[in-house]
């Protein structure tokens, strides 16, 4: 049965740890990181059109239509598949831009998977992930939809099964420039690689944290406040800060104390993304 319209979630991710092993000749950094999803994110609605036009109806401040990763993902998939159909796209955006929780990458992956379904292309996960990698290093993990240990620039993925606590995520009102952090001379770039799987507990360090905390007082403040209740971590290069709790009630309790002065949300960690659970339910 063909569908005309489809609404899919576009979940956030956390980097439970992030180690920087060195800088490559192409300027990118060799990383090791552990990705986990949150049952929290944007919602994207797709509606088929038969004239081949790709149109995103939701405007993003400061982002031209054709520069949006959602539009880029749709156009690349259309070009490479030879599909003659078009798509109308709307997004209910709640994930912050530049927060380190994968908003743009997740949107691109949801677009690839949603259009593969609506356009009935029959592309497998490997092919979609390879296309996703041309859009951004974090897109493949969202395409594959499973918590993973990532290496290289983040594209070599091994499934992992970390605990799935409740998280309180704080969102400092500042956008961190990833390029700025990775070019900081004080950034640690020589962490020894982790060679055992699963990733041993206790490897929860983010090598970007000292640099981000030094440059951005808003992030430093969030880390200090959350750190009074649980281990406070940085996801990606920030700006979002998070901590795990054994129950929703405990996360909610701390959230009530901290969100008087800080923006934040409580969400369940998940090793299978809510996007993939939704797609499975459509089969």
UniProtKB/Swiss-Prot annotation:
Gene3D superfamilies: 3.30.230.10, GHMP kinase, C-terminal domain. It comes from the Bacteria. Keywords: ATP-binding, Isoprene biosynthesis, Kinase, Nucleotide-binding, Transferase. The keyword Kinase applies. It holds the Pfam family GHMP_kinases_N. The keyword Nucleotide-binding applies. The active site is at residues 13, 138. Its EC number is 2.7.1.148. InterPro entries: GHMP_kinase_C_dom (IPR013750), GHMP_kinase_C_sf (IPR036554), GHMP_kinase_N_dom (IPR006204), IspE (IPR004424), Ribosomal_Su5_D2-typ_SF (IPR020568), Ribsml_uS5_D2-typ_fold_subgr (IPR014721). Coiled coil: none annotated. Belongs to the GHMP kinase family. IspE subfamily. Catalyzes the phosphorylation of the position 2 hydroxy group of 4-diphosphocytidyl-2C-methyl-D-erythritol. This is 4-diphosphocytidyl-2-C-methyl-D-erythritol kinase. It comes from Pseudomonas fluorescens (strain ATCC BAA-477 / NRRL B-23932 / Pf-5).
């Amino acid at each position: 049965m063909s569908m005309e319209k489809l609404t899919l979630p576009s979940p956030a991710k956390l980097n439970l740890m992030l180690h920087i092993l060195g800088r490559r000749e192409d300027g990118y950094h060799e990383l090791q990181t552990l990705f986990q999803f949150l049952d929290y994110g944007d919602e994207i609605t797709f509606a088929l059109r038969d004239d081949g036009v790709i149109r995103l109806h939701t405007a993003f401040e400061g982002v031209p239509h054709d520069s949006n990763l959602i539009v880029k993902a749709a156009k690349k998939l259309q070009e490479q598949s030879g599909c003659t159909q078009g798509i109308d796209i709307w997004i209910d955006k709640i994930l912050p831009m530049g927060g380190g929780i994968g908003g743009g990458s997740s949107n691109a992956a949801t677009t690839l998977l949603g259009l593969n379904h609506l356009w009935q292309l029959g592309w497998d996960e490997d092919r979609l992930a390879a296309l996703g990698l041309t859009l951004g290093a974090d897109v493949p993990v969202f395409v594959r939809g499973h918590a993973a240990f990532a290496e290289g620039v983040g594209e070599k993925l091994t499934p992992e099964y970390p605990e799935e606590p409740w998280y309180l995520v704080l969102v400092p009102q500042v956008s961190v420039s990833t390029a700025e952090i990775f070019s900081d001379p004080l950034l640690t770039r020589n962490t020894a690689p982790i060679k055992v799987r699963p990733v041993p507990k206790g490897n929860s360090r983010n090598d970007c944290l000292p640099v981000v905390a030094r440059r951005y007082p808003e992030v430093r403040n969030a880390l200090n406040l959350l750190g009074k209740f649980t281990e406070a971590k940085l996801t990606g290069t920030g700006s979002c800060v998070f901590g795990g709790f054994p129950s929703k009630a405990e996360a909610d309790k701390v959230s009530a104390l901290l969100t008087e002065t800080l923006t934040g949300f409580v969400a369940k960690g998940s090793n299978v993304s809510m996007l993939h659970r939704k797609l499975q339910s459509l089969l």
